[in-house]
Structures are given as structure tokens and as C-alpha cells.
Amino acid sequence: MEDVWLQAQSNLAKVLTHQTFTTWIEPIRFAGAHKNTLLLEAPNQFIRDRVRESYLPMILESVRSLTDSHFQVELQVAARQQEKTAKSPRKSHTEDELGPVESEKCAPAEFSTNLNAKYTFDTFVCGGSNQFAHAAALSVANNPAGKYNPLFIYGGVGLGKTHLLTAIGNQVLTKNRKARVCFYTSEKFMNELINCLRYQKMEQFRNKFRKMDLLLIDDIQFIAGKERTQEEFFHTFNALYESHKQIVVTSDKFPKDIPGLEERLRSRFEWGLIADIQPPDTETKVAILSKKADSDGIRLPDDVALFLASSASTNVRELEGMLIRLGAVASLTGKNITLDMAREVLKDIIVDKTKEVTVEMIQKYVADHFNIKVAELKSDKRLKALVVPRQIAIYLCRDLTKASYPDIGEKFGGKDHSTIIHSVKKVDKLLSQDFELKSTIETLRKGLLN
């Protein structure tokens, strides 16, 4: 059966690019066969997961062309790699926070700070998009329960809210090792509350949280609509505030925009300082990538950093994930990171913006997508079947071209620039609420860029 795999590899080499084949298929080894299943091994989990995700159907087709249509392929990590992983098990952040409530006990009064030591002010890249939030967080860290209590930081996913929140805790502990600091997601706070209610240990729960010097709660929006959790957090907030203890929370929205959040909590969040984090510009993204690459020992060429920053989303976490993937491929294959490698390795999650998109291209593409005429898209007709595509097209023009608001208005039938601004803001606001709209715009964006 090993001959079958070698032949299948040879066939795949003819249809895949050299870069793809040598990176993902060549490292796969024959491990045996059982009945009608071919057993294959990847040298590590990273390659196994990537091959399973992107190339397993192609592998299966190649193997079946040499055997029969009922043949199966099973891909595992090499045994020696599994043993290495087993010796150093790591529980993921998600498991820690979102594990089954039934399996947990109510946490004792003693606590862990839950702080990630890597998230400090030194490792945070400051730019125009996050400068205000950074300054506010640093001020709170240097003077807890001073001017800004509570501190409410809000912004989109992956922009650095958790980093700043954790940096505050780490800075406070650097100055005072005896400070009672605790970082919790609102989900974990709720899970612990549920368990303490179940085991009738509410006094222990209250003693734990109401005796903190600094309470850091991430993603507070998740307690919205949870009456008992909001009730308990409200009293915890009051107890800490009245004791002149610092409270810092993060959210993906401004307090007034969180649906299901009680008015009494909303008003308390507005007592202190509210700071927002905006998506980073290209220069800031390049700086973030460079700092992360230096920290992780990854040699990242300037042209690749610029390619990632120009082509990727504004989600910093996603940006760093791409860098980690590139670093892993370079390390596992013994090759240097190049622009060609970046395009190949990240082609499933990145779009290349080197092709210039024009307003006219967007109008034609959106009109075709919604099966309407370009003239209707540019008209003043207020039919819903035309208004929504028109607003989407205007939003994409602002997002993908360098055209100014007046320029866009001129190309949409001479509309006033204030109308164009309204359309952009309207779509921008709806994107956080309407997942169908978000999916449509993402599909159109990728189609235009590809």
C-alpha cells in the first residue's frame, strides 16, 4: 500500500504548484493500512490540520483513482509528535472559559489573577487608532481608582481591548505585588456565579469579587439579557466603587448600544471614562507585525509585512494569526518567508489588493449581483430593492477606492456628499447587527478584489 501513496503523491505533484506540494503534501508519510483505509502521518499537528482542511478531498480522490471508490484515508500526527504533545498538555483559553458548567465547582475564595504575562504596555503597539484608549489605560494602571473609574473600553473584535485590559493588571501588580487583581471574561464570571448558586456558596462568591483592588472584566456585553448575572455584577460594581477600588470593563459596543443591558448598569459605565479603539491604519498594522515578528523570532521581510497589512482585515488577532502561520511554515519547511510564500500559504484567508478597483467596477459588479441595472443603482428611486444595493455599492466604493465622498456622489447621479456619508454610516452601523448583510458585503468585496 505504500506504493499507492507514493503514486498518489506523484499524481498530486502534477496538479499542485511546487510551493503547495512541497509545503503540504510532500511531508505526509505512509503509516500503514487497515482493511480499506490508508493510514497517513503528518510530521506535526499544524500540517495535519491544514491538510485536512484544504487538501484531504484531493488526496482521497487521488488514492481512490488507484484503488476503489470505497477506499478511505485517515491522517494523523506522527506518534513521536503525539507523545511530545502529551508530555506537555495545554488547556486552551476557550476550554478554560467555556467548559461545561456541570464539570466545574464553585471557585474558592483564593484566586488566580488569570493575567497573560505577555500582554503589557511594552508589547502594545500604539497608533492613532488606539492612542486615546492606551493613554486612558496607562493612566488607570498608574493611578487606580483615580480620575477614571470605571474605565470602559470598547471596539471591534481583535483590536487590542483584551491586551490593554490585561496590561493594566500586569502594571498594577508590578507596582504592588500584594494587590488583589483579577481578570475575568463575563462568561466565566457568569459560570462561576451559576456554580456558586448551585452549591449554595454565594457568600464565598461575593467575598471573592467584592474584595478586589482591581477588577477587570472582558466582553461585558455577554451578560446582557442575563438578569441574575447583571444583578450580581451590579452589586459587585457598587461594592467596589464605594470602596474606591478600580473597575475596568471592555465591550464590542458603546454602553447605550448594548441590547439587553440594564439601564442601571449602563449609567454606571458612563460614570467614568469611555474610550474607543478604532481599526488600525496600514502603518500601525505594519508596526504590529514587525513587533510580533521580532518577539517570536520570525524573519519578516518588509514587502511581506506591507502585503499583509494592505491585504488583511483590520482584526489584529487575525493579522497575528497569519504571521504565526507563515512563521510555522517557514520553520517546518526550512524556507525563508517570501511574498510568493505568503500569497500561497494565506490564499484562503487573504485577498490581494494590488488590483485597483474603481467606482465603475463596483457599480457594475453590485448591479449584476442584485440583478438590477447600473442606471437604477445610480438613480434616486427609493424602492427597497434599489436602496439596499445602492448603499452597499456606496459603502464598497468608500472601502475599496480612493474616491472622496463628493467624487462618489458625482458618480452616483450627482448625489450630495452628505447623502454618501449617510449611506456609509448606515451600512457601517448595520454590519454589527445584520450577519446576512455582512456576508453579502464580504462576498462582494472578495469578488471585486479577486
Curated annotation (Swiss-Prot):
Residues holding ATP: 158, 160-162
Region (Domain III, AAA+ region): 114-330
Pfam families, A to Z: Bac_DnaA (PF00308), Bac_DnaA_C (PF08299), DnaA_N (PF11638)
GO cellular component: cytoplasm; plasma membrane
GO biological process, alphabetically ordered: DNA replication initiation; regulation of DNA replication
Alphabetized PROSITE patterns for the sequence: DNAA
Region feature (Domain IV, binds dsDNA): 331-450
Protein origin, superkingdom: Bacteria
UniProt main location, coarse: cytoplasm
Region (Domain I, interacts with DnaA modulators): 1-71
Matching InterPro entries: AAA+_ATPase, Chromosome_initiator_DnaA, Chromosome_initiator_DnaA-like, Chromosome_initiator_DnaA_CS, DnaA_C, DnaA_dom, DnaA_N_dom, DnaA_N_sf
Cellular compartments annotated: Cytoplasm
CDD domains given in the database record: AAA, Bac_DnaA_C
Region described as Disordered: 82-103
Gene Ontology molecular function terms on file: ATP binding; ATP hydrolysis activity; DNA replication origin binding; lipid binding
Keywords carried by this UniProt record: ATP-binding, Cytoplasm, DNA replication, DNA-binding, Lipid-binding, Nucleotide-binding
Ranges where the record places region Domain II: 71-113
Subunit structure: Oligomerizes as a right-handed, spiral filament on DNA at oriC.
Family to which this protein belongs: Belongs to the DnaA family.
Domain notes: Domain I is involved in oligomerization and binding regulators, domain II is flexibile and of varying length in different bacteria, domain III forms the AAA+ region, while domain IV binds dsDNA.
Function in brief: Plays an essential role in the initiation and regulation of chromosomal replication. ATP-DnaA binds to the origin of replication (oriC) to initiate formation of the DNA replication initiation complex once per cell cycle. Binds the DnaA box (a 9 base pair repeat at the origin) and separates the double-stranded (ds)DNA. Forms a right-handed helical filament on oriC DNA; dsDNA binds to the exterior of the filament while single-stranded (ss)DNA is stabiized in the filament's interior.
Protein name: Chromosomal replication initiator protein DnaA
Annotated organism of origin: Geobacter metallireducens (strain ATCC 53774 / DSM 7210 / GS-15)
